[in-house]
A protein has these predicted regions:
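Long, low-complexity, charge-biased intrinsically disordered regions
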Residues: 1-198
Length: 198
């Protein structure tokens, strides 16, 4: 599944043309800046354009889990976007310019094994010290759900942030189990959860 045409239309709307691309959605080693940390923090001149493009990027995450974290970051500044937020959107668009045909591949597999992976960055947002949870789930080796979302509360330790991520993934796995049961699809093996705690 891919949204290549949608991506190309989005790039056209944004005025991205030519061969210029970016290798990653965000700069290598990206950290959420603290308030006042970036000198060029004046308001972006066209917040309506910012909101329109970020809204389209949010829709694109349906088939592009590789951009979820970056879109999560730029979508937090919809009310008063700054110039440096716009540069993040531009970089994301350049990344899409080089990867417009990517999507989610679904293979033919009779396995119903459900596996989930989760991670959290402890206090990754240096402005409010909240962590971001990320998880993805696979059925029979096929990616079926994914999410990147800022946690609602500040975690006091990396272990707490990881447990919160595992809770979100557990909720997702229980939901998937219910859907499989409703569809009368039997699971031969127990669900597996993997969590990175480094």
């Amino acid at each position: 599944m891919s949204q290549r045409k949608y991506t190309l239309d989005l790039l056209k709307d944004a005025g991205i043309q030519g061969d210029k691309t970016a290798k990653m959605p965000l700069e290598d080693g990206y950290k959420v800046p603290r308030e006042g940390e970036i000198e060029d923090s004046k308001a972006f001149h066209d917040p309506k354009l910012y909101r329109k493009l970020v809204g389209k990027l949010i829709y694109l995450t349906i088939t592009r889990p590789d951009i979820c974290f970056a879109v999560n970051q730029v979508s937090q500044h919809m009310q008063v976007p700054k110039d440096h937020h716009w540069r993040m959107v531009e970089r994301l668009l350049l990344y899409l310019n080089g990867t417009s045909s990517l999507g989610v591949w679904m293979g033919c597999n009779k396995s119903t094994e459900v596996v989930g992976y989760c991670d959290a960055d402890w206090a990754g947002d240096r402005a409010d010290r909240r962590s971001t949870t990320g998880y993805c789930t696979f059925i029979g080796g096929n990616l079926v759900t994914w999410k990147s979302k800022k946690q609602k509360v500040v975690s006091c330790s990396s272990a707490e942030a990881e447990y919160r991520a595992m809770l979100k993934l557990t909720n997702e796995l229980v939901w998937i189990k219910g859907i499989l049961k409703h569809l009368e699809i039997e699971q031969a093996t127990p669900m597996t959860m993997h969590c990175d705690n480094q």
